[in-house]
Amino acid sequence: MDLSPRNRPLLESSSLDSGGSLSSLDSSVFCSEGEGEPLALGDCLTVNVGGSRFVLSQQALSCFPHTRLGKLAVVVASYRRLGALAAAPSPLELCDDANPVDNEYFFDRSSQAFRYVLHYYRTGRLHVMEQLCALSFLQEIQYWGIDELSIDSCCRDRYFRRKELSETLDFKKDTDDQESQHESEQDFSQGPCPTVRQKLWDILEKPGSSTAARIFGVISIIFVAVSIVNMALMSAELSWLNLQLLEILEYVCISWFTGEFILRFLCVKDRCRFLRKVPNIIDLLAILPFYITLLVESLSGSHTTQELENVGRLVQVLRLLRALRMLKLGRHSTGLRSLGMTITQCYEEVGLLLLFLSVGISIFSTIEYFAEQSIPDTTFTSVPCAWWWATTSMTTVGYGDIRPDTTTGKIVAFMCILSGILVLALPIAIINDRFSACYFTLKLKEAAVRQREALKKLTKNIATDSYISVNLRDVYARSIMEMLRLKGRERASTRSSGGDDFWF
């Protein structure tokens, strides 16, 4: 009889109650599709997965010899044939417990996930369990010895996208947890004044840890905003502006940023690792141009006019870097951090978006240039000028400085705008789903951090007998409710945007 996955004996299962037994089942449960007569009870085995019992055909399981149950069927057959000899393999190597008398084998796994595994044994097709995250489903099928490449084509694309997103966020979470553990356990456990450095670090890096930290965070945000506004006013030539006052304000803001960076630098022990972090690099780039500008201006006093012009250009370039101060708000904004995570994760989608735009710009700019070049006073003087027009048209900005005048040119412009709308809509939906997932993941993490800090503070107060009467259960319940609320918002957001495939 052919035992191929499409033509093998039909596998039947039954979930029994606690009082059920193998002999109480009707013999039709064990009927094979090819022969039309019941299989012998000795050809079946009972597996108990998470409290649910399933009666399976050993003959059908043997069609999958590389899976856990396929190996179990072979081991059970060998065990029956050889008995309890030393050479016979034991079924306990493949299951958590066994009852050889009733031919029942126990597995402490999810019975809901096992139903998908059972369907695979029946049909040879593995479908993804939507109620389980991708990584948990992968752990389940790996336990049963099924490769993820066996997932059917209808679920494969959705599964691998969810798995990639889960792995990325888990890696980010593990990295952040390791960094947090490194800072709390290594940076302050050694060196002078560990308690002072720990408290100072909490004020600088954890705005919600105390009242002083919240005040410091607000002041830091104010200085960033004042610095940006001051930079904009210094570039404006207005008669009522006091440039000397603006310069003094610039010195004050730079002094604050410098002191903040030095305090962070002095608090940590691994300073090389501190300087490699992106937020600290941004802080350094925000203050270095100011000091380099002062140094260049002080050294350019005895140079010629040409050299002074070159120095002036260098100073202007360095002053442009002051705009990076806006990125300092990322320390206090979950949205900005989520944007950074999204760009990091969606580099393929962003590259695809740029590729689509580049192809469209190249095609439509060339067509538009040749359609408009016969007009005497045309604004399409060259293909690069047409590039600018195609860019503003495909992104639906439309400055109007360059526009077509001929009928053919207007038809091409309509097609350019329409293609831009369609092309931009494709990857942006994916990027939006990733941003929503990253944002709510960070919010959940912040809620967990606040819960951990509150529990640590209560534990410390209890240890010193200086605590106020607080119900620890209520604190824990409030934190859990906050995380559940955020998780519910995440589900609602992903479903409303059509992003069920990215919910994990």
From Swiss-Prot:
GO (cellular component) term, any one = voltage-gated potassium channel complex
Q: What is the lineage of its organism?
A: Eukaryota, Metazoa, Chordata, Craniata, Vertebrata
Membrane spanning segments where? 215-235, 243-263, 281-301, 314-335, 350-370, 411-431
| Basic and acidic residues bias: start-end ranges | 172-185
* Notes on the domains: The segment S4 is probably the voltage-sensor and is characterized by a series of positively charged amino acids at every third position.
Assembly and binders: Heteromultimer with KCNB1 and KCNB2. Interacts with KCNC4 and KCND1.
Biological role: Potassium channel subunit that does not form functional channels by itself. Modulates KCNB1 and KCNB2 channel activity by shifting the threshold for inactivation to more negative values and by slowing the rate of inactivation. Can down-regulate the channel activity of KCNB1, KCNB2, KCNC4 and KCND1, possibly by trapping them in intracellular membranes.
This protein's species is Mesocricetus auratus (Golden hamster)
Give a brief account of the tissues where this protein occurs.
Detected in brain, throughout layers II, IV and VI of the brain cortex. Detected in cerebellum and hippocampus, in the granule cell layer, Purkinje cell layer, pyramidal cell layer and dentate gyrus. Detected at lower levels in olfactory bulb, amygdala, thalamus, hypothalamus, midbrain and brainstem.
Q: In its UniProt entry, what is this protein called? A: Potassium voltage-gated channel subfamily V member 1
For the Extracellular compartment, the record's topological domain ranges are 236-242, 302-313
Q: Which SMART domains match?
A: BTB (SM00225)
Q: Which compartments is it annotated to reside in?
A: Cell membrane
Where are the disulfide bridges? Answer: none
InterPro entries registered for this protein in UniProt: BTB/POZ_dom, Ion_trans_dom, K_chnl_volt-dep_Kv, K_chnl_volt-dep_Kv8.1, SKP1/BTB/POZ_sf, T1-type_BTB, VG_K_chnl, Volt_channel_dom_sf
The stretches that face the Cytoplasmic side, renumbered to this chain, are 1-214, 264-280, 336-349, 432-504
**In what ranges is there compositional bias, type Low complexity?**
10-22
